[in-house]
Amino acid sequence: MKKQWVALAALALVWGAAAQAQEQVVNLYSARHYSTDEALYNNFTKATGIKINRVDADDAGIIARLKAEGSASPADVILLVDAARLWRGEQDGLFLPIKSKLLEDAIPANLRAAPAADGGIPWFGFSTRARVVVYDKVRVKREDVDTYEELGDPKNKGKLCIRSGAHPYNLSLFGAVTEHLGPEKSEAWLKGMVDNMARAPKGGDTDQIKAVAAGECQIGVTNSYYLARMMRSDKPEDRAVVEKVGVVFPNQASWGT
């Protein structure tokens, strides 16, 4: 029978299950590369004596590796970045649904997968990120970009910069909007966004921030930490970019982050 894996964006599973295993080793495949994670791994090993064998790669590389290894894969825990990638792994049948009161008590229902037929949950969320709107503080009024819906409003025609809609960051945003607005309204919203683009989608999130600051467009969409990196940068040119843009965490009066 094909082996499946547990997809966790939380190491709580390791605390609850792997710590009881006879082998004092956990094999972790991770697409996350942050200093906070390093501290978490080190603290876990200090507290339990369990060694973490880690394989680092991007999300696509990890999924491809799991498929190639098949039932021989040594992976115990998988960390992927973004719900869209977790969804893809779930659809590919790579995750083993588990029942864990510890995880279910610690992680809200909106940050974990829907239960499988046996009641097990394929994956749990470990952290969240905000998809924010940046805007030209001179040419755009904050109230015109207070919601995601306004990105598709005709009043913002010709103002929008955004990376490819095929990127998981945007797929997750589109999925969230569809969840709240429904398919018909979200389709109209997406068409409105296309009509509002100042240029064809290109670059990453940092490029959208820079494009707004440079006047190529007036509104951009980015994950919040890209802006935070530029704010903390030692480069004067990065800080100059940040000075030119405002930031909105959309839909604060309703379902936003």
Where are the regions that the model predicts?
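A structural signal for short loop-to-beta-strand junctions that line the ligand-binding cleft
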Residues: 73-78, 96-133, 149
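Short loop->beta-strand "edge-of-pocket" segments that line small-molecule binding or catalytic clefts
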Residues: 149-168, 176-178
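Periplasmic solute-binding protein
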Residues: 86-94, 116-146, 174-175, 256-257
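Ligand-binding pocket segment of bilobal, Venus flytrap-like solute-binding proteins
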Residues: 165, 169-172, 176-249
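Short beta-strand->loop
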Residues: 96-106, 123, 149-152, 236-255
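Bacterial N-terminal signal peptides
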Residues: 7-16
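Alpha-to-beta junction loops
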Residues: 50, 69-78, 94, 156-158, ...
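Early extracytoplasmic/lumenal segment of secretory-pathway proteins
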Residues: 22-88
